[in-house]
Amino acid sequence: MEQSSQNWFSSVETPIKVTGRDAVSWDESRDLVVVGFGGAGVATALQSLDNGLSVIALDKFAGGGATTINGAVVYAGGGTSVQKEAEIADTADNMFNYLKQEAEDIVSDETLRDFCDTSPEMIDWLQDKGVKFGSTVWHKKTSYPGPEYFVYHSDNSLATSYKKHATPAARGHRGYVPIEEGRKATNLGYSIFNPLKQSALDKGLQLETYHEVRQLVVDDNQEIIGVMALYFDNEKLLKKYQKLKQRAERLLMILPPILPGYNFFAKRAMAVLEKAKALEAQRSQKMIEAKKGVMLSAG
């Protein structure tokens, strides 16, 4: 589909085509450019920094994405350090036997096995970067436990049909937050995201917020060599834009969509967002070279 099509509803634009790297006057240059700095983006940035790459991360807004507004839940098992502390018996084989019933042939056994085998390592990796988990257990099936509990049965392993082939184990891991704060169950993802972000910054990450990427830059060989980002180079305009976005977010969070009255606040939020959108036309362009690659993790 061409961008000129009446059915093109995305803000993404066709790539900027150049003859080569030397044909561009780059404003920034890094080994890796990460587009979208939420959970996937920060994990990619951290791993790349650990591997010795220079990294710049760009986010259209303040960063964090859906990761920061969720309940801070990580699904993990196979004998994680948190499970062991909570005296929950689980192994990678047991986790595989359960998930194989759920996934059937949707993913290959090799991929599923790798997920189960490396699950404890993932929790260790998160903890090494500063993420803290609680170990109090809610022993029944639930979509989300009370604020006092940090490990719970987030899957269906307690169901009779699944217990025939695998021993039930609590695998929902919640990032630790104070109990009173945990009562709201949303906007708790900072307990996972913030430590990862700080770790990445400490390792040398260059983070640029309120930088929207709509176009890749490609050369004659169709190799992706960078991105073009839109940003506010006027501090006053940026602050005005941020205030409008924050106001709209507050309006949208007043009520969940399923409750009466949500549409009233949603319409007010949309009106505020239109004002913010009008400011976007005053942004400037920034050309950023990616010497080794571009990671798209923008949701």
Predicted regions and their residues:
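N-terminal Rossmann-like FAD-binding beta1-loop-alpha1 element of flavoenzymes
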Residues: 30-57
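Core beta-strand elements of the Rossmann-like FAD/NAD(P) dinucleotide-binding domain
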Residues: 25-30, 281-293, 297
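Extended, non-globular alpha-helical segments
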Residues: 2-23
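Conserved redox-cofactor binding core of oxidoreductases
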Residues: 11-14, 116-284, 291
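Redox-cofactor binding/interface segments in oxidoreductases and associated redox assembly factors
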Residues: 35, 76, 296-297
